[in-house]
């Protein structure tokens, strides 16, 4: 599995992820990029779950963004509808975190599109650890969104055996 965290603070949104790819209890790769920029670098996206499944979803989501001229919520809802109703897509096991300058969302295969509380999202095997760390940092420090995402991933990686310390961090300023 993996850990993906998204933090929004002070006109900055960040999505960060670790790089570990596991097959069962074996680490297959330690430097995977699970966070990407989409739609002319205006949308950030990260995934947790099956790598091949996530790439399929990235492609579908990017097509939805193109179709809806970069409108994040409409694209997310359309992807979630397809994911829930299409027999092939329904078998995909991944979750997406997406963000632009307006919103941050979680998209699941159950057809859920969720906008989080506290401008904070964390998914994957280390998601609960990263979320707790990020929430504490949001409430008790003046750190930037990028610093909070970085530190919360470090903490998750220290606790979760399916999360490592190789990080990909993408940021949008607005």
Swiss-Prot record:
NCBIfam families linked: ATP_dep_HslV, PRK05456.1
Q: Name one GO cellular component term.
A: proteasome core complex
A GO molecular function term, named singly, is: threonine-type endopeptidase activity
Indicate how activity is controlled.
Allosterically activated by HslU binding.
**What's the protein name?**
ATP-dependent protease subunit HslV
Biological process annotations from GO:
proteolysis involved in protein catabolic process
> Which of this chain's residues are annotated to bind Na(+)?
157, 160, 163
Write the Enzyme Commission number(s) for this entry: 3.4.25.2
| Organism in which the protein naturally occurs | Shewanella denitrificans (strain OS217 / ATCC BAA-1090 / DSM 15013)
Q: What does this protein do?
A: Protease subunit of a proteasome-like degradation complex believed to be a general protein degrading machinery.
The gene behind this protein is: hslV
Looking up Pfam families in the UniProt record yields:
Proteasome
Name the catalytic site residues: 2
């Amino acid at each position: 599995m993996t850990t993906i965290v998204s933090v929004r603070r002070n006109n900055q949104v960040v999505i960060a992820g670790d790089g570990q790819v596991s097959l069962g209890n074996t680490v297959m790769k330690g430097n995977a990029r699970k966070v990407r920029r989409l739609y002319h670098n205006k949308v950030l996206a990260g995934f947790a779950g099956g790598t091949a499944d996530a790439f399929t979803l990235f492609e579908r989501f990017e097509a939805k963004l193109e179709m809806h001229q970069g409108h994040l919520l409409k694209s997310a809802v359309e992807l979630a509808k397809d994911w829930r109703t299409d027999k092939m897509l329904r078998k995909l096991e991944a979750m997406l975190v997406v963000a632009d300058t307006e919103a941050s969302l979680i998209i699941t295969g159950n057809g859920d599109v969720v906008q989080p509380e506290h401008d904070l999202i964390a998914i994957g095997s280390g998601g609960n650890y990263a979320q707790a760390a990020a929430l504490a940092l949001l409430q008790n420090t003046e750190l930037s969104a990028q610093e909070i995402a970085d530190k919360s991933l470090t903490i998750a990686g220290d606790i979760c055996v399916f999360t490592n310390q190789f990080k990909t961090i993408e940021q949008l300023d607005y």
